[in-house]
Amino acid sequence: MAGPQRRGSGAGGGERRDRKGRDGGAGAAEKTAYVERVVAINRVAKVVKGGRRFSFTALVVVGDGDGTVGVGYGKAKEVPAAIAKGVEEAKKHFFKVPRIQGTIPHPIQGEKAAGVVLLKPASPGTGVIAGGPVRAVLECAGIHDVLSKSLGSDNQINIVHATVEALKGLQRPEEIAARRGLPLEDVAPAALLRARAGAGA
């Protein structure tokens, strides 16, 4: 009797291991569902008794590539740990970005500290015309066609946050039309409305 019981116990253990493996695979897939971009890594020195203590900071952009994006700033003694903290911080600051057929609904300018970023809608196939920091935010947000220009500081942190402010200020054409009391056709480019209507059909 002892032998069959041991075999049964082993089968149960195998089932538990299989279940754990399946769950672990699902968790890994969930973790990699986001697009991550490391914009900047800096080394920071702190003067203490006996010398200097070094740490690293990481500016990270995380998004789902489908209208959700966030920015985080992590600090740790090692680069991988700083990036991991930045990713978690970015996820805590997720926000939704209005889009029409892969571009933004209207031109907008975002400002943060000395950073100033101008974004303009672009027709399909244009691509993301932007510098590194701006491109990281736009691609993580799932914006595929847009024109941009940095009008202020060259500081990457300021540029990223100015881009975030611009995206947060975007409104859907319906919202703009309702606020102004105008027909939808008067506040949104006809090409964008046709493209959206075609996608809906």
Swiss-Prot record:
- The signal peptide stretch is none
Query: So what does this one do?
Result: With S4 and S12 plays an important role in translational accuracy.
> Which one Pfam family would you cite for this protein?
Ribosomal_S5_C
- Listed transmembrane segments: none
Where are stretches of biased composition, namely Basic and acidic residues?
A: 14-23
Per UniProt, subunit arrangement is: Part of the 30S ribosomal subunit. Contacts proteins S4 and S8.
Q: Which UniProt keywords apply?
A: Ribonucleoprotein, Ribosomal protein, RNA-binding, rRNA-binding
Q: Name one GO biological process term.
A: translation
What SUPFAM superfamilies does UniProt report for this protein, alphabetically?
dsRNA-binding domain-like (SSF54768), Ribosomal protein S5 domain 2-like (SSF54211)
**From which domain of life does this come?**
Bacteria
**Gene3D superfamilies the UniProt entry points to:** 3.30.160.20, 3.30.230.10
Instruction: Name any one GO molecular function.
Output: rRNA binding
Record remark: domains: The N-terminal domain interacts with the head of the 30S subunit; the C-terminal domain interacts with the body and contacts protein S4. The interaction surface between S4 and S5 is involved in control of translational fidelity.
Protein name as annotated:
Small ribosomal subunit protein uS5
Region called Disordered, residue ranges: 1-28
> What organism is listed for this UniProt entry?
Streptomyces coelicolor (strain ATCC BAA-471 / A3(2) / M145)
Q: Report domain S5 DRBM positions.
A: 34-97
What InterPro entries does its record include?
A: Ribosomal_Su5_D2-typ_SF, Ribosomal_uS5, Ribosomal_uS5_bac-type, Ribosomal_uS5_C, Ribosomal_uS5_N, Ribosomal_uS5_N_CS, Ribsml_uS5_D2-typ_fold_subgr
